[in-house]
Structures are given as structure tokens and as C-alpha cells.
Amino acid sequence: LRHNIGYCSTGSYKGYIIIPSYDGEGNLNYYVGRSYYKSDFPHKNPTASKNVIGFDMLIDWEEDINICEGAFDAFGIGENTIPIFGKFMPKKLKAKLIEKRPSRVNVILDRDATEAALDVSQHLLDNNIDAYLVQVPEGTDPGDLGVDKMKELIDYAEPLNLMKIMEMKFEL
């Protein structure tokens, strides 16, 4: 019930699980569709702008924030996790992070998005927000690993600095 997940039995989303996202006032700001059955098209997303703060209504901005790619990744990470519905941080999220200034932001993108994760981290550091790059093992994602393993990876993540980001970008 927390995420208000639904299922479509008719229409263009027939056979898809629908995961809605709500803004801070409780208004629908985005949704993702995921096929319940094996499909050539497992994801079906709207053509709407992704310049939203995913699951904003569920975020406690006074606590540490987790940023990840998708809704199912967010479920695998647990509380206070914002899916960015892709690899790039939306402008609205950038602005809200600067406004709210959380004490720690854990950046948790898939391994194939390491460069994007470093860019997100650099933006946070440029705005004096502590960034931690949480790297999931190759070939997995947070949704595969689950909350307990993700908590362990988050707990062991070290804070980034600009020098470390540059070193990591050079190694890509």
C-alpha cells in the first residue's frame, strides 16, 4: 500500500504492473509500467517529462538520501530512496537537494552508469553536499540484492572528494 502499486488487466498497459510516483503534495508526477509476464518490452513508461522527484511524497529530507535508477532498484534499497527513472539527475531533484541540504547522499546507479554516477556525485560535492558512491557488484542491481545487502554496501561506502572522482573517471 505504501507505493500504491497497481495492475492493468485492460488497455495499452494490459499485463503491466504500474508503479506511481507522487510529488511532495501527493499529486501523481510520474509512473512506470513493468510487464508481469515475460515480454520483449518489459518496461513501458509514459512520454511525460522525467524532470520529477521520484517518490518525493515518501522522502524524509532530514535523513540520508539514496538516489538510484529505477523504481524496483528503490524497492531493493529501502527507505528514503529516490529513483531518477534513468541515469541522469533531474533538474528538480538537483534544486531540491541544494535547498534541503541532506547530510549525506548515497549515489547507487548500475555499474554501466558509473560515469553518470560520478557526474551526480560531483554535482553534489560542488554544492557542498556529502556524496557517497555505492557500487553494486558487476552484473547485479539493487533490486536483485535486496535491502539487507544494500544496507551493508551503503554502510561500507566511503565519502567521495573531487580528487577521487577525477581518478575514477580517468580509469573509465
Model regions: which residues?
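TOPRIM metal-binding catalytic domain and adjacent DNA-binding surface shared by DnaG-type primases
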Residues: L1-I18, Y22-E25, I59-D60, A95, ...
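Phosphate-handling DNA/RNA-contact segment within nucleic-acid enzymes
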Residues: S9-R104
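Acidic beta-strand-to-loop metal/phosphate-binding motif
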Residues: I67, S103-A116, Q135
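Short phosphate-binding/catalytic loops that engage adenosine nucleotides
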Residues: I82, N128-I129
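Acidic, metal-coordinating catalytic cores used for nucleic-acid/nucleotide bond scission
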Residues: F88-P90, L109-L118, D141
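Short, surface-exposed amphipathic charged segments that create phosphate/polyanion-binding patches used
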Residues: I98-P102, D141-Y156
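Short, aromatic/basic amphipathic alpha-helical patches
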Residues: A116-N128
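A generic structural motif
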Residues: A131-D141
